[in-house]
A protein has these predicted regions:
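Acidic, low-complexity terminal tails and accessory targeting/binding regions
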Residues: 1-3, 76-77, 83-97, 140-142, ...
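Active-site-proximal alpha-helix that buttresses catalytic centers in soluble enzyme cores
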Residues: 3, 8-75
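Generic beta-sheet signal
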Residues: 5, 142-150
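Phosphate-handling substructures
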Residues: 28, 69-127, 195, 204
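Short beta-strand scaffold positions
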Residues: 54-55, 126, 147-148
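Glycine-rich phosphate-binding loop signature in dinucleotide/nucleotide-binding domains
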Residues: 46-48, 135-142
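Short, active-site-adjacent cap segments at secondary-structure transitions
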Residues: 14, 59-61, 84-85, 152-154
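Conserved histidine-centered catalytic loops in small-molecule metabolism enzymes
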Residues: 48-80, 101-107, 183-207
Length: 207
């Protein structure tokens, strides 16, 4: 039987200082992020789910909570869904007063194809595929939800669709609380990908 594994990016994080939080613990959703999570929970009500998985990070767990509340299912924490590793976490990364102002950090930026600042794309793809198929197997004949993070979701989708992994981060199609759905065939293999933004009306205005 065909299945769909929905990968959801977490909602907006409370981060007034614009810090790269990465895998740091304790980053919670903003009020708007909590609204996004409620919208995603309502969106999920129509689904027939057999598994709900999440990244271990707080922002992902807060995003998945309304989904769990809509379905009588246990929540599984999967380390493979965690944010991409990044040596810059805990710092600002912006022109002017951020990391780009400090030459000692430039050595990490020279080769985005094999990012020296964090987790190699190949490793990211491998663990995200493991997460996808783990959710598939846990769901039985039903669909599944995995709550994760922008870069892991986007790189997984790019690999599946044959897109170049080297990319402009500003052009990723993976907004806050968005849904990237991997549709599987009767053999459990990825057949196609679709994308939607149930919480689009809550997205911050682009500057």
């Amino acid at each position: 039987m065909a299945q769909t594994i929905h990968f959801i990016r977490h909602g907006e994080v409370f981060n007034p200082e614009k810090i790269l939080y990465g895998r740091q613990p304790g980053w919670r959703l903003s009020e708007r992020g909590q609204e996004m999570a409620q919208v995603i929970g309502d969106w999920s009500a129509a689904l027939s789910l057999g598994a709900i998985h999440t990244s271990p990070l707080q922002r992902a767990k807060e995003t998945v909570a309304p989904i769990v509340a809509k379905h009588n299912l246990p929540l599984a924490v999967d380390e493979n869904l965690i944010e991409a590793g990044n040596i810059f976490e805990g710092k600002k990364f912006e022109l002017g007063n951020g990391l780009l102002k400090h030459p000692d950090m430039w050595r990490y930026l020279w080769n985005p194809w094999k990012p020296s600042w964090g987790e190699p794309y190949e490793e990211l793809i491998s663990r995200m595929l493991k997460a996808l198929f783990f959710a598939r197997d846990n769901a039985g004949d039903k669909d599944a939800i995995c709550v994760s993070h922008q870069l892991p979701i986007w790189i997984l989708r790019s690999a599946v669709e044959g897109r170049r992994l080297l990319h402009d981060p500003r052009k990723r199609e993976c907004t806050l609380a968005s849904v990237t759905s991997f549709h599987l065939d009767s053999e459990g293999m990825i057949e196609s990908v679709s994308y939607s933004e149930p919480a689009k009306h809550l997205l911050p205005a682009k500057k």
